[in-house]
Amino acid sequence: MRLLPEAALEVRPVRLQMVATAPSVAHIERPVYARWGYDYWQQRPDGSVLIGGGRDVLRDDEETDQQVSTAQARNYLMSLLNDLAVYEPITHAWAGIVGYSASGQPWVSQPREGVYGIGGYCGTGNVVGTLLGRSLVELFVDGDSQTLRDFGYLN
């Protein structure tokens, strides 16, 4: 990890990639997480479809901190779109870097005095990151955090 060297042994960067299509006549009823969350998609109100995934199929190529969309990922995602009967052109493609922990559990640590680190949410940072961030604030302000205790981060 670039921001906190102590996290490098616990959290590794992983690239997640997505594409968006032009509005589609296909109907996708609800957001979907398929293949244990490796693939995911949803349709926006305007009919466009957002789809991401393939990290496990692309394997080692995705264990990187390079935030670029690749042709391999776009091809994989286009094949998923075809399986969903979505044939509209791709209008946008992007990639983002997230942290994955070796244990599958978020990394929470105080590696040195006055420094705390949280990360390695394995793709759930939008929810778990907020929860753990608030829990650290609770620890700083109140001297304790029941949430951190419940997750086993405090004795």
Show which residues each predicted segment covers.
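C-terminal catalytic lobe of FAD-dependent flavoproteins
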Residues: 36, 79, 83-155
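Short glycine-/acidic-enriched loop or helix-start segments at secondary-structure transitions
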Residues: 3-6, 30, 61, 127-128
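Active-site lid/adjacent beta-loop-alpha segment flanking the redox-cofactor pocket in flavoenzymes
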Residues: 10, 27-103, 110-111
